[in-house]
Amino acid sequence: MTHPNTATPPFIAVVPARLASTRLPNKPLADIGGKPMVVRVAERARESGAQQVLVASDAQAVLDAARDHGFEAVLTRADHPSGTDRLAEVAAQFGWSDDTIVVNVQGDEPLIDPALVCGVASHLAASHGCAIATAAHPITDPAEIFNPNVVKVVLDARGVALYFSRAPIPWARDAYQPHWPNVASMPAPHAPAVVHRHIGLYAYRAQFLRTYPSLAISPIEQVEALEQLRAMWHGERIAVLVTHEVPLPGVDTPADLARVQALFGS
């Protein structure tokens, strides 16, 4: 992984988890090797070196599971539309200073690399003028470029996000146009048309989290169904840490859960 040239700053990891999941009910409590999924995620967050790990949920059962395994847990409202909104409530409850770095470790990522969690926190600390940091990796499979479930990000010369999209960006005109619309025959991306896949891991400055709930939803956020575009619409800059290690997938479906359970010997 590409790490920033800075010592790891103090940071807080928050694991937002909710029971309401249409594809996998009670997902945070799913058993993985004898422990609930949310606990597996919190353990990975702890391994990242975070000075504090919090589980945030609107479900008492999730809070109890976290506390039973020694993790701090905080009750949040049930009406949050996103994990970022849940983090914003936690930031308000704890009253963290403006420059406190808070990493959102999604509650369905039991295989997340602790080094990546630490990496985005360090990258934000080194990215002055940015309120948010996230991560991405180069795409090598042409099929992923044209998959709308794979979010792409275009970076500027400083590694700051220019745009996130489900569309194939940047569009390599000379390489793709002769094959369009036959996606199966598209060539693999190559320099200078490097395509980056966004990794859904975020570090925030607490000051931004306090302002986030007051930001109006943006048209591009609604069209793309990507909440990070709200911050960009309102002028916030997002620093992107590029890693060449492809992260292991999270758990969205029963099949995903079975795959992860097998890795833990469940």
UniProtKB/Swiss-Prot annotation:
Known function: Activates KDO (a required 8-carbon sugar) for incorporation into bacterial lipopolysaccharide in Gram-negative bacteria.
Keywords from the named record: Cytoplasm, Lipopolysaccharide biosynthesis, Nucleotidyltransferase, Transferase
Source taxon at top rank: Bacteria
EC number: 2.7.7.38
Recorded metabolic or biological pathway in which this protein acts: Nucleotide-sugar biosynthesis; CMP-3-deoxy-D-manno-octulosonate biosynthesis; CMP-3-deoxy-D-manno-octulosonate from 3-deoxy-D-manno-octulosonate and CTP: step 1/1; Bacterial outer membrane biogenesis; lipopolysaccharide biosynthesis
GO biological process: CMP-keto-3-deoxy-D-manno-octulosonic acid biosynthetic process; lipopolysaccharide biosynthetic process
Alphabetized InterPro entries for the sequence: Cytidylyl_trans, KdsB, Nucleotide-diphossugar_trans
Similarity comment: Belongs to the KdsB family.
Classification via PANTHER family: 3-DEOXY-MANNO-OCTULOSONATE CYTIDYLYLTRANSFERASE, 3-DEOXY-MANNO-OCTULOSONATE CYTIDYLYLTRANSFERASE, MITOCHONDRIAL
Principal subcellular localisation of the protein: cytoplasm
Designated name of the protein: 3-deoxy-manno-octulosonate cytidylyltransferase 1
Catalytic activity: 3-deoxy-alpha-D-manno-oct-2-ulosonate + CTP = CMP-3-deoxy-beta-D-manno-octulosonate + diphosphate
GO MF annotations, alphabetized: 3-deoxy-manno-octulosonate cytidylyltransferase activity
Record's GO cellular component terms: cytosol
Localization (cell): Cytoplasm
